[in-house]
Amino acid sequence: MLLPYLNKDLIEAGCDEAGRGCLAGSVYAAAVILPVDFKNELLNDSKQLTEHQRYALREIVEREALAWAVGVVTPEEIDEINILNASFLAMHRAVDQLKIRPQHLLIDGNRFKKYQDLPHTTVVKGDGKYLSIAAASILAKTYRDDYMNELHKEYPFYDWNSNKGYPTKKHRAAIREHGTTPYHRMTFNLLGTDPQLEIPF
């Protein structure tokens, strides 16, 4: 069972992103404030769940959270400010939209750019440790998956309904054959041939 909070006396928002390592598409982030007594034994890191479980849990989170929101940063913005800053910006945009102002942010990962005057704590593999971060990971993942499924209808060659924009062999083969789209991140190592273009984390 994941932990319900880091500090019971503060309004905490868990934050996570999806799509950082993709070659195409926006990066999504979510922020979620759960009730302190929220319990769900299935809720875990979205990568550990089936697609069906993720969407079922999304409904529960949206229904039972005190507040939740999703932030998006486009491929053009990613190319302009780099993917790490874009991930932070997506989280900031999600927090911006929360109908309740949190007093503390729980961030998945080991780095974060401070949001206004709010204190934050970074938690490595936080989506497997805290309920609010796990909930945010599910919202970010499912909303981004919905977006990539829509893009797939426009550009079916790239298999985005399956790979969601990640660098699979089929995705890179399609880039070689058909070129790039307006949704590809042009600063990324799209063909996997130039290691100097990889962005270090």
Swiss-Prot record:
One of the Pfam families matching this protein, by short name: RNase_HII
Protein keywords: Cytoplasm, Endonuclease, Hydrolase, Manganese, Metal-binding, Nuclease
Compartments, as annotated in UniProt: Cytoplasm
Gene3D superfamilies in alphabetical order: Ribonuclease H-like superfamily/Ribonuclease H
Keyword Repressor: no
Taxonomic lineage: Bacteria, Pseudomonadati, Bacteroidota, Bacteroidia, Bacteroidales
Protein name: Ribonuclease HII
Enzyme class: hydrolase
Reactions listed under catalytic activity: Endonucleolytic cleavage to 5'-phosphomonoester
Family assignment from sequence similarity: Belongs to the RNase HII family.
Requisite cofactors: Mn(2+); Mg(2+)
Keyword NADP appears in the UniProt entry: no
Functional summary from the UniProt entry: Endonuclease that specifically degrades the RNA of RNA-DNA hybrids.
EC number: 3.1.26.4
